[in-house]
Amino acid sequence: MPQPPVPRESRVRAGIVPPYLLLRIAAAEEHYDVAADAARRSLLRDEPMRELRVEGAHPGLLPHEHTRSATTGRDHDVEAEGEGAPVDAAVPEPAPDRRISDAQGAESLPGHLVRTEGQPATGDVAVDQAYDGLGEVWALFERVYGRDAIDGEGAPLEATVHFGDHYDNAFWDGERMVFGDGDGEVFRGFTQSISVIGHELAHGVTEMTARLRYRDQSGALNEHVSDVFGALTEQYAMGQDAEAATWLIGEGIFTELVQGRALRSMLEPGTAYDDDVLGRDPQPAHFRDYIVTDADNGGVHLNSGIPNRAFALAAVELGGFAWEHVGRIWYDALTGGTLRPNDGFAVFAAATLAAARERYGDVSREVAAVANGWRAVGVEPE
């Protein structure tokens, strides 16, 4: 069964845009009148974030049998059945339950419900992008990993769009995904990126499973897991293999005024943007460059680049579709019940290696690729 809900006062507002980037924008008022003001107000809204301090982990789901959908052609998982087990045709197929609300520029949640599952497109771009994006995230988790929604039991997928006045972020608040429209100078609307939508929903999955504390190394892992499943959602939706994938998080949310491709690059941390005003992407790509700081909840958005690169390197080494191999390993590690809220990189690396051995065998390409990925970024599994 899923973990009991986290009390609202203990929930983390896990935003996709790091505070260090908002601070740079806030200080750039001579270049961006609207964006600087929007960034300052966004920082004030995000300041009351609380740390997640919940102990324990959900044991997760059992391994699933690998099958291919006859209707979509995509890979997905079904519960392994005993030989000759009868199939109950009356059991309905899992389906998403999407509920999109509109905050109409206010900061109160959830806003006005404007589109529910099965309803036609509204014509509001943000509403319809959120609806479609949630469908893609649900498809990845259900068809590949056998997880029906965030809690694994078909809970509604709730999202609110048009949050705040020029709000420069998107976040998971413990119940729903919330998307701002951006300021129009630096950021476009945050529903434009499937990787952002997948990133935010994955925070909910982490909250229901390993509950990685949102600070220091465990917080960087929390952000890393969301980046992983954000990237995999985009790759799955677009049918991209590991070589064709961009490995970018938030591609398309910068306007043409910014010299940058995205918020983060998983394959090449530190290269996502290099802008005369906003500066250069500060993410480290190796553990020797780990940033010790009190800001950004102990550098959760900064240091997530280290495990991000380990994952991407393992996926590229294996080739093919990343969600089929390294994605399965990371999902097994996240939901396997061995992680604790304060675990760091070395413990998580060991969990992924154990998951790879369990699924693919001690002597396998998958185990070697995962080990090589962690070795390349200087993390020694504990």
List each model region and its residues.
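Zymogen propeptides/activation segments of proteases
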Residues: 1-195, 207-382
